[in-house]
């Protein structure tokens, strides 16, 4: 069970230098996005049984349901008659790195009444991103879902999602809310905000005080995998000709979770991280965050 943001992504990659105050040739693409929706799509595409809950504008609710269904996700989307679907304009640099301009729109209006009855009845895992903890209305939903998951004995997985949003909230509060989650997937910047360390191995080790499995994503430097009581393990990135890094971390998370959901406690964690790195490397070679 995944709950969180759904967005309309607009990807903009200038061709050559930017001409301030005038026209700049660019490659522009519109794609479905949203961190939680992307992660759900990759989990389902790679074999997991996934239900997703979120809120979108009524005008394109059918489009987003169809896009998620295309990857195998059972989409429970509330259609908001008064707000647009969240939108992100993503400026892609020549090296594939991104700068994002975000209007979360209908995502910010998600509420408990949008969750269908019995949504967690058949779930084994609840997966949330940090975006669901960033605003008071959403935080209420996130904390309620976490309480329900814990009372039912469900595992929880967390992707902190955004260093900028984490910096606006209290990192200590986020750690407290998500304490005991089975898996956490911060990137380097998010991990640094959460634990105040600069070294990725130290970040990962510190985070195992709160989570059972920690995977610190390092982009082209791969990732660090850590579990309590054992030295962190470095997993290298797969080489790739990067055109657009949008969704690479989401694909990594979804791929790792697909292996963990399939194999449970028997999961070969380094092999799962290596598989996730391979999937993420495929994503950066093209535009868009979802499976083709």
Positions of predicted regions on the chain:
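Short, conserved phosphate/pyrophosphate- and ester-handling motifs at nucleotide-, phospho-/glycolipid
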Residues: 43, 187, 249
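Glycine-rich phosphate/adenosyl-contacting loop at the front of the ribokinase-like
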Residues: 1-53, 62-63, 242
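Hydrophobic beta-strand scaffold residues
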Residues: 50, 75, 156-157, 214
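Active-site metal-binding loops of divalent metal-dependent hydrolases
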Residues: 6, 131, 251
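Conserved beta-alpha-beta core of the PfkB/ribokinase-like small-molecule kinase fold
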Residues: 125-202, 221-223
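Structural alpha-helical scaffold elements that stabilize or flank donor/cofactor-binding regions
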Residues: 118-119, 174-177, 207
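Conserved N-terminal subdomain of the carbohydrate kinase-like
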Residues: 20-22, 45-128
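Conserved phosphate-binding/catalytic region of the ribokinase-like
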Residues: 1, 148-151, 200-292
């Amino acid at each position: 069970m995944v709950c969180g943001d759904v967005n309309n992504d607009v990807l903009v990659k200038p061709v050559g230098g930017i001409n301030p105050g005038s026209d700049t040739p660019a490659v522009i693409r519109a794609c479905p996005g949203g961190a939680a929706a992307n992660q759900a799509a990759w989990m389902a595409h790679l074999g997991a049984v996934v239900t997703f809950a979120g809120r979108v504008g009524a005008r394109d609710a059918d489009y987003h349901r169809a896009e998620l269904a295309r990857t195998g996700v059972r989409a429970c989307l509330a259609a908001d008659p008064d707000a647009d679907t969240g939108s992100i304009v993503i400026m892609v640099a020549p090296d594939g790195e991104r700068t994002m301009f975000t209007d979360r729109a209908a995502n910010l209006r998600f509420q408990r009444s949008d969750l269908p009855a019995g949504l967690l009845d058949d779930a084994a895992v609840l997966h949330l991103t940090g975006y669901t903890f960033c605003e008071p209305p959403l935080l209420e939903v996130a904390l309620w879902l976490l309480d329900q998951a814990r009372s039912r004995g469900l595992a929880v997985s967390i992707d902190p999602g955004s260093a900028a949003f984490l910096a606006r909230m209290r990192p200590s509060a986020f750690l407290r809310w998500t304490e005991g989650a089975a898996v956490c997937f911060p990137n380097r910047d998010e991990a640094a905000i959460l634990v105040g360390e600069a070294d990725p191995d130290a970040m990962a080790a510190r985070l195992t005080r709160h989570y059972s499995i920690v995977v610190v994503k390092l982009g082209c430097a791969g990732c660090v995998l850590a579990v309590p009581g054992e030295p962190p393990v470095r997993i290298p990135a797969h080489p790739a000709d990067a055109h657009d890094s949008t969704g690479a971390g989401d694909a990594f998370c979804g791929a790792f979770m697909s292996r963990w959901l399939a194999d449970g406690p028997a999961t070969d964690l380094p092999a799962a991280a290596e598989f996730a790195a391979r999937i993420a490397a495929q994503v950066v070679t093209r535009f868009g965050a979802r499976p083709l």
